[in-house]
Amino acid sequence: MKIVHVTECLAGGVLTFLVNLTSQLDQEEHIIIYGKRDNTPENVETLFGDNVSLIYWKSAQREIRPGQDFAALRELLHDLKQIPDIDVLQLHSSKAGVLGRVAARLLGLQKRTFYLPHGVSFARQDVSPKKRQFYILIEKVANAFAGTVIACSSSERDLLTANGIKNVVVINNGIAVPDKEPVYKQPGKPIVFGTVGRITFQKNPQLFNQIARHFQGDDRVKFLWIGDGELRHEIQESGQVQVTGWVTPDEVQNYLKQVDVYLSTSLWEGLPLSVLEAMALGKPLLLSDCVGNVDTVEQGANGFLYHDAAEGIASIQKLLKASPDKILQLGKTSYKRVANDFSLRRLRQQYRALYNII
């Protein structure tokens, strides 16, 4: 089977997903037509196996610019025409999703086309309501051109269908989950509440800081942000709050092992890989109740969802009063949940079944 992937941003979560998917479906031929971002690794092709080839999409860019977008569509059409016998066309992220579905319609590939948003554009809270309505309109038009939409979580599917997007299926994001359970860590003194990610508006560092400041001077608790970003200044570092700065993937794992409870303050997600990685390490979850986050928490069984700072603070106070055995049990349930519902093995099975429908 020949699978062609198209993305304007071969970086971050899209890159991780494609590395995982192409390695899981290693008997298939994959061709990736890609655009670059500032955080696209040098020699990105070395991250993929021998079953993958890459084509650089030089006109691709994130922002809506009609002239540049027309050039990107023309280049994409040219590249797709050079690839014989395409079995599956899979589009990743919003811009590739729009241009790719137009191209699919023009080339007669609409029934072989799948679109994976990696986070729905109109879920964004960093744009005006008017712009969100514009994004919904664009998605509806593109949806009519071609293909099936793949939501990476049930809550993302619900958001899509509630806004008039049709022909949506769910395949949960997945990660490599070790067959052997992790060594569960007794919560320390202080208990470390930590998160992983770029410090951006989406991740809501203001809320993270607000929660942390409530516990200022309380030596029972510490807060850790693993990562860096343009809004680092919104997190007030102190003896209680540490920001690691940019670290390697191996260092991320080492820091994450030090965390007792994974804390997310995100405003929106698709289905966050960092949360799944924390679950695979047996971490209890304390997550904001946004799209994507809500799919990972079984309330009271592997952690808690909260709506605002007051609820988040109350949940931390509850965890501080809980016995170490209770916190360990929350972590064990996290591992079982990720192993059952969010593994690469399950993702591979579901994608194979989806592609075989064609």
Where are these regions (language model features)?
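Conserved donor-binding/catalytic core segment of Leloir-type glycosyltransferases
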Residues: 4, 186-203, 209-213
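N-terminal strand-loop element at the rim of the active site
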Residues: 5-68, 159-161, 229-231
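Donor nucleotide-sugar binding/catalytic pocket of nucleotide-sugar-dependent glycosyltransferases
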Residues: 55-56, 140-181
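Nucleotide-sugar donor phosphate/pyrophosphate-binding loop at the beta->alpha transition
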Residues: 70-74, 112, 122-141, 145, ...
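Nucleotide-activated donor-binding/catalytic signature segment of Leloir-type glycosyltransferases, i.e.
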Residues: 234-250
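Aromatic "clamp/platform" in nucleotide-sugar-dependent glycosyltransferases that forms part
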Residues: 267
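Short hydrophobic beta-strand element within catalytic cores of glycosyltransferases
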Residues: 284-287
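Conserved acidic donor-binding segment of nucleotide-sugar-dependent glycosyltransferases
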Residues: 299-300, 304-310, 318-324
